[in-house]
Curated annotation (Swiss-Prot):
Function: Catalyzes the last two sequential reactions in the de novo biosynthetic pathway for UDP-N-acetylglucosamine (UDP-GlcNAc). The C-terminal domain catalyzes the transfer of acetyl group from acetyl coenzyme A to glucosamine-1-phosphate (GlcN-1-P) to produce N-acetylglucosamine-1-phosphate (GlcNAc-1-P), which is converted into UDP-GlcNAc by the transfer of uridine 5-monophosphate (from uridine 5-triphosphate), a reaction catalyzed by the N-terminal domain.
GO cellular component, one term: membrane
Protein name per the record: Bifunctional protein GlmU
Organism: Tolumonas auensis (strain DSM 9187 / NBRC 110442 / TA 4)
Taxonomic superkingdom: Bacteria
The keyword Transmembrane helix is assigned to this record: no
Localization terms from the record: Cytoplasm
Residues binding UDP-N-acetyl-alpha-D-glucosamine: 8-11, 22, 73, 78-79, 100-102, 137, 151, 166, 224, 330, 348, 363, 374
Pyrophosphorylase, as annotated region: 1-226
Cofactor annotation: Mg(2+)
Primary gene name: glmU
Residue segments, region N-acetyltransferase: 248-454
Pfam families with a match to the protein in the record: Hexapep_2, NTP_transf_3
Binding residue positions for acetyl-CoA: A377, N383, Y384, S402, A420, R437
Length: 454
């Protein structure tokens, strides 16, 4: 039986007080609904149906590569009505799993359990027991069997004492679900068509309803306001940090670590406080990342050390590199083994060769730098002429003195020495010494100007 997943994402999210649709608000750097889509995809669903309404253009623009079937709910008439909009394109022989775009923490393990316990021709329902169930629909049972769900606003005082609540997540056979949805009414306090009412309909039709509980209660929490969004973020990060530590990564303070992508680590990796990981990041064995660093879409090989407050994006570092503090590697930066990039050095689309060093206050853009090169403090590759970028090539064993400007396109051949304060506009030959400084003048008896009194 094929699996179709319906994700409800049509709500406006008024309490967010935002023009952005609620499900596009980020957790771990990605829209909440993107997490749900990825979880659904991990279940090998044949098709994912995304029910949208408010902010449809923004959602389609943000999720244009999500590979989902877009289902419009023009009027928000309740969760039952929302699911009904997706049903016409779902074959009768399929099973339907209903998820929510604002519950990004739901795990594949929990959903696989739910799919396993679903009875034939019946409903698998995800419930959770809460110490404070206020606001949630209560699970009604008779002789231990689920017979219905009552929403908070429709519950009696006695029913409000029930602590087993509905998460909204359920799986049901498509043919029967279509029948149950067609019988829904909006005779309730909200005047809406509740998806929860299909539970009573299934019970009355003689279908079995089995329940499962999530791995942890926080998985099924949603976000209706910024406070709840922040709480989801913290739980996500706590879970991510715990998993990394179980895999052998040292986090000096797990509460001050943010994972906004994926992180693959070798053995004995150490991350100091306030490190942020974005995109896909790979760290080799014994890599150390200092406090306040931001790593995005990069690979850092064994025994490299990144000192505090460095930013590395779209870059590849070989073994034993040292970077920072306060360095910036922009997309296209490559460091060969044992290369060193020091404080306030910026690389963009540049390769620094084996054992080469750029220790201080330099910009190296669109550059190819060989092995055993010393880049003096204040060196600038002038790569942009106002219209086009040009390349600087510095071959092996070159010594570049401090405060040197290399006006690209230019090549400095092997073993050359560039004197401090030089502006290099022409190619330099092998083992040449180049100086372009003006002659130093000495004026004796010089008196500084005196400030005139007003």
């Amino acid at each position: 039986m094929s699996l179709h997943v319906v994700i409800l994402a049509a709500g406006k999210g008024t309490r967010m007080r935002s023009s952005l649709p609620k499900v596009l608000h980020p957790v771990a750097g990605r829209p909440m609904v993107s997490h749900v889509i990825d979880t659904a995809r991990s279940l090998n669903a044949e098709k994912i149906h995304l029910v949208y309404g408010h902010g449809g253009e923004a959602m389609q623009a943000r999720l244009n590569d999500a590979d989902v079937e877009w289902v419009l709910q023009a009027e928000q008439l309740g969760t039952g009505h929302a699911v009904a909009q997706a049903m016409p394109t779902i074959p009768d022989h399929a099973k339907v799993l209903v998820l929510y775009g604002d519950t990004p923490l739901i795990s594949p393990v929990t959903l696989e359990t739910l799919l396993t316990i679903q009875p034939a021709n019946g409903i698998g329902l995800l419930t959770v027991s809460l110490a404070n169930p206020t606001g949630y629909g209560r699970i009604l049972r008779a002789d231990g069997q689920v017979v219905g769900i009552v929403e908070q606003k429709d519950a009696t005082a006695e029913q409000q004492l029930i602590n087993e609540v509905n998460t909204g997540v359920l799986v049901a056979p498509a043919k029967q679900l279509k029948q149950w949805l067609s019988g829904l009414t909006n005779l309730n306090a909200q005047g809406e068509y509740y998806l929860t009412d299909v539970i009573a309909a299934a019970h009355h039709s003689g279908s079995s309803i089995q329940t499962a509980q999530p791995v942890c209660a926080q998985e099924v929490e949603g976000a209706n306001n910024r406070l709840q969004l922040a709480q989801l973020e913290r739980f996500y990060q706590k879970r991510a940090a715990e998993q990394l530590m179980l895999e052998g990564v040292t986090l000096l303070d797990p509460a001050r670590f943010d994972l906004r992508g994926t992180l693959q680590c070798g053995e004995d990796v150490l991350l100091d406080v306030n490190v942020i990981i974005e995109g896909q990041v790979e760290l080799g064995h014994r890599v150390q990342i200092g406090a306040g660093c931001v790593l995005k879409n990069c690979r850092i090989a064994d025994d490299s050390i990144i000192s505090p407050y460095s930013i590395i994006e779209g870059s590849v570092l070989a073994e034993g590199c040292t970077v920072g503090p306060f360095a910036r590697l922009r997309p296209g930066a490559e460091l060969a083994a044992q290369a060193h990039v020091g404080n306030f050095v910026e690389l963009k689309n540049a390769r620094l060769g084996l054992g080469s060093k750029a220790g201080h206050l330099s910009y190296l853009g669109d550059s190819e730098i060989g092995a055993n090169v010393n880049i003096g403090a204040g060196t600038i590759t002038c790569n942009y002429d106002g219209a086009n970028k040009h390349k600087t090539i510095i071959e092996d064993d070159v010594f570049v003195g401090s405060d040197t400007q290399l006006v690209a396109p230019v090549r400095v051949a092997k073993g050359a020495t560039l004197g401090a304060g030089s502006t290099i506009t022409r190619d330099v030959g092998e083992d040449e010494l180049v100086l372009t400084r003006v002659r130093q003048h000495h004026i004796t008896g010089w008196h500084r100007p005196v400030k005139q009194k007003k």
